[in-house]
Structure formats: structure tokens, C-alpha cells
Amino acid sequence: MSKFLDPKADLTFKKVFGEHKHLVMSLLNALLPLEEGRQIESIEYLQPEMTPRTPFSKDTIVDVRCEETGGRKFIVEMQMSWRASFKQRVLLNAAKAYVSQLPSGKEYHLLQPVYSLNIVNDTFEPDMEEYYHYYHMVHDLHTDKVLEGLHLVFVELPKFRPSS
């Protein structure tokens, strides 16, 4: 029996990254595709529960949710085993975090990007050798044209090698 807790286990993950700001900032800065000079320097934790505004919408809970002083929002999830619906759940959670920023009567330019970092202890893209998968909205023909808003990152732990 191991004398150490597995950091991938749900409660341990939430305890480590949900209560130690410097650790979650280090993780986010290391794994998110942040622009040069836009590293995260300060965060505040947000409630992990995202209650819908409409009565028949789904409640969702994430492992860690926080925002930085500049307004960017971050979601961190640890998923032990892959389910086909996980990508849709990630997209739903990120979209909810995005739209919840804008109360009625506020201007659209106030919306800040939402970054969702998802660490998966399973292989879900077996035909790809990369362990790091970054999704965001880009123009089909002109990939330098990006719609700011949702940034989804998935890390497949079984494919990761320290030399990667």
C-alpha cells in the first residue's frame, strides 16, 4: 500500500489544486496556450457549481474554477477514465462559464475568454501520437483568424513522457 495519495484521485486533486493558488497557477501557466506576456499572476477561486439561470437547464460541477484579476476564467478538470460524452460536457461547462459573465443589459465587449484544462488519465485519441490537444474557434481557411472566447485543452496522461 502506498503512503502517498494519488494526485489524480478526485478528492486529492480538488484539495491540491482547489486550495493552493500557486499550484493551480503553475499548472495553468504550464499547460494553457497563453499569449506571450499574459501569464497568470493572481487568481481568485470561484464556486465549482454552475447553476443555470433557466429552470430546466442542467446543473454542472467542475473540479476547480477560478478567474484572474484581468477577468479571464479558468476551469480545471481531472478525468480518470474517458467517456464519449466528456468533450460535450467540457464544452457545456466552458460555454456556461462564458455566458454567465454577461448579465442582461451589459455590453458584449466585456466578455472574457474561458480556458478549460482537462487532464485525462486515459487515451481518447488512439490514432494520434500527441498527448496535448488544443481546440478553439478558427476560420476554416484562414487559421490566423480566431474568435476569442472558448479555449479547450485536453492532456492524455498515458501518452505523456517527461521528455515530451
Q: In which residue ranges do the predicted regions lie?
A:
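Elongated, amphipathic alpha-helical interaction scaffolds
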Residues: M1-S164
